[in-house]
Amino acid sequence: MLDTLQKSLEISPVIKKNNYYYFINPITDGIPSVEPELLQEIANHIVENTKMNVDKIVSIEAMGIPIATSLSLKSGVPLSIIRKRKYGLNGEIAVSQSTGYSKGQLYINGIESGDRILIVDDVVSTGGTLQSVIKALIDAGSIIDEVVVIVERGEGVSKLKEMNIPVKSLIKINVDEKGVSIREVNGGKQ
């Protein structure tokens, strides 16, 4: 189950910046190249384990894009990308977001009141970005059907669940000076 994803994480290099360990992986960073087999494995797994009874798949640039695109192609569900750039379009929603390591603005376009949404993201650590996005989408009248994160690290998923939103993670990891260790794969302990 998710063997390609597991292997890619297990060999991920880890760097330390400001007392925080970052893992470098194709799914979360695009380094090294994102192999088609990895995207196919993830998209297949999500389609097989998620209702997919939604109007739109929503993801956040940058690394949510390849995952969400693969999922859109596999499922036939339209895709909307939350951007880091302001376009100034009618109905554009600005979202202030902060994570454990950055702050900034995101911009939502192409979402309508009543849209049933599946949010897909590459990784969640603190949950700060997704909390802000979920709140903005709900305030805009969207219905968040489910959130799927590929890699769960830290306590961010717990914070999202406190918002009474169904959240799934495909794989849970720990990261330290020794590297990436897998804690759980889609509900099964390692």
Swiss-Prot record:
GO function term, MF aspect, one: guanine phosphoribosyltransferase activity
UniProt entry keywords in alphabetical sequence: Cytoplasm, Glycosyltransferase, Purine salvage, Transferase
Gene3D superfamilies named in the record: 3.40.50.2020
GO biological process, one term: IMP salvage
Record bears the keyword Transferase: yes
Pfam families the UniProt entry points to: Pribosyltran
Name of the protein: Hypoxanthine/guanine phosphoribosyltransferase
Gene: hpt
